[in-house]
Amino acid sequence: MRAAETLLRAGLSAALIDEAPLAGGQIYRQPPESLRRPARQLYGSEARKALALHESFSRLRTSIDYRPETLVWGAREKRLLLSGPAGNTELAFDKVILATGAMDRIVPVPGWTLPGVYSLGGAQVVLKGQACLIGKRPVFIGTGPLLYLVAYQYCKAGAEPAAIVDTSDFTAQIGALPRLLSQPATLLRGIWYNAALVARRVPVFRSAKPQKIEIRGRQLVVTFKRNGKSFEIGGDAVGMGWGLKPETQLAEILGCAFSFHAGSRWHLPRCDAMGRSSTEHVYIAGDASGIRGADAAEAAGELAAFAVLEDLGHTVPQTRRQRLLAHLARAERFRSGLERAFPYQVPELAGDTVLCRCENVTVEEVRAAISSWQISELNQLKALTRCGMGRCQGRLCGSAAMEVLAAETGVEISDVGSIRGQIPLKPLIGARFQRKAAP
Amino acid sequence: MQCDVCIIGGGLVGCSTALHLVRAGKSVVLVERDRIGAHASGANFGGVRRHGRNVLELPLSTRAFDIWRNMGTLVGNDCEFMPTGHLKIARSEAEMAVLEQWSSFGAEHGIPVVLHDRTSLRANFPWLNTSSFGASFCPGDGHANPRLAAPAFALRAGAEGAVVIQGDGATTVEDARDEFEVTLHSRRRIRAAVLVNAAGAWGRHFARYYGDEAPVEAVAPQMFVSEPVPYIIDAVLGMVTGGLYLRQIPRGNVIFGGGRGILDPNCHRSSPSDRVFAETVGLAGDLVPSLRDIAVIRSWTGVEGHCEDGLPILGPSPRRANLYHAFGFSGHGFQMAPAVGAVLSELIARGFSETDISALSPRRFTGAKSSILAESEI
Ligand SMILES: Cc1cc2nc3c(=O)[nH]c(=O)nc-3n(C[C@H](O)[C@H](O)[C@H](O)COP(=O)(O)OP(=O)(O)OC[C@H]3O[C@@H](n4cnc5c(N)ncnc54)[C@H](O)[C@@H]3O)c2cc1C
């Protein structure tokens, strides 16, 4: 939205394509009209920012080619392939800014596929978009700022979280403080959420090692170990997530070069500070090129638009440009702090854990295949085990599969490869391509 | 490194040749530039059919049929081969005539087929559309999992003594007295008395070293897979026109192909075309109407060597002794590769094979233009 706004202000014609029915992205997602609630309640401390963004977007709406509920299912050269209310169409472009965001990163735990277990992002989507809760007494497991934010938002919405089970330890969080101080406001917000959770007596367990999730009677019971002792916490739902991972499939299809990012243990598209990718006409902004959060995403959106303008020969306001660059640099430092505070560690996975839920492939099966087929690369693993071959095409299991492969073979995680993306970027219904009516 | 036979190319053709040769007592080094089965052999449709093949391929195809039925015993993995039968659809009377004609060729080669008219199609294959004119059904043909086949052969060959090199391609081939010297990308060298050129779409390159020309070009057939849905399509489908081929696996996914994707300029890789995507997905919904309501989850392509006359380049080089070509399988190699290895190992180890592959010889391009009819379908 910030990128679009900047481009329009400079007099360019722009189209905004969004899979969601209403603007706002993940963080400032809007519920449908019938489920409207006050912004303060929906977005908490971020309400002002959310409102500002929604307002500036509604001013834009009439001057932009806005296409909600539209999926970009592929791209070739300077054409995007769209699937939306208008059917399947194409859109030619000169420059494209990818602001495709991120999704939850999941570490599989035995039982994670049970009904009632959600990702943290999913728990947030139902809350903001559908005004529902995953449960009245959810247990939240994982790590990262989202763990505390979602728990806090659930409290505000009237839930009473049974516990927060954090796999990182407190000393890591203290150790990361110097870096986190690069964004004092964000850090404060984090501390505030924590304090609010303490005030509400939500138990927080750090350095926890989740063992399993089970259904017992009408409860979901989470078992975890901490300092050698075993704990059980029951609730009526589970939300889990280990930070976010960028949605990079479109960048891949557009031929952008990637490199491995050690902090997030993931392959990220290579971009300059302004968001220029290695493909001349492709720019990337926000979480899509590395997780830096919402405020940084607004800055990055504007910067990517500046980059487009510069490359088209326009002049851009230099002081503003510098300010935004400095903001992003701070966000980058903050991110490295977060990566320390909430390191993404994949624990020793139990053999019977389902690794790929689409194809129901267990860790044990994957390990056996790695040794019997002498597998050393992720696409080979997929071809021989079906892990990552289902509906989500490895979005959910790809990261954990990389870890299992690296651990089994001793190959560096940076060298086991990543699952190759192809069209369609998301499942596409065949009927959309039907020329004739059914006979 | 010294060996009896060096094989360039770790597709199913190369891997099957390696296994048969080690079993015939030869020392073998197989060289694969990328990963075993990374190209056509791993990306293909998985159709295992004799049905509708060019008659000149039938001796080889028939022999392959026997191997496929015993794949488990041969390589220790059945590669998910399922003899569901193959159904070839005619949309008009003229197309039906093609099927009728083939049924008599089939009979001569011991491949009986059943012809269906519109009514019996409806009765036997209720999931099919109602607009097809007729079809021919070939029992025994079927499908297998291409992702498993080449790796299974390579693993077996390796276990029985073949040296399998991956991620290191052959860059040059030179004569070293009466032997071949193959230099790899890593500068490693391999000396071999016999060389097998099984480099798939890239085989022409090595053939040219010895002046063997073959009109083989790289093409990129495009594939699709749907989300899993209940298993109902219990035969492999093809069309007389070749525009679409389709199968379902018991897991539920429907796998289909048709049209060609886009080759990279250097012809090393390829990617799906969105235009072909729209066309082929549309065609699939025409043929099996229930497919209209299900989602396609992925499309992909593979690089295949396509010969002008639709037949592989298979047999000894007309110009260089001890050089064998086995490339350009023109969309038919997955089914035939297990037999290709058997025949080549007989030629190399014993000097003759009972399977007649003379019509596929590279010799056919040395002079007189051949008058062989093209059959381009996969
Ligand atoms: C999408 C698609 C669908 C198909 N469907 C069917 C089907 O249903 N039924 C059927 O029977 N056939 C089908 N085919 C055809 C079949 O897949 C091929 O004919 C067969 O796999 C060819 O095997 P190959 O070993 O010759 O080629 P490939 O599998 O391509 O192997 C050749 C290998 O040579 C290697 N190579 C090349 N140059 C060098 C070098 N310099 N050094 C070392 N290695 C080198 C390559 O990396 C490659 O791995 C299909 C093909 C495609 C692409």
Regions found by a protein language model. Name each.
Chain A
Residues M1-T385, M389-R391, R395-P439:
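Residues forming the flavin
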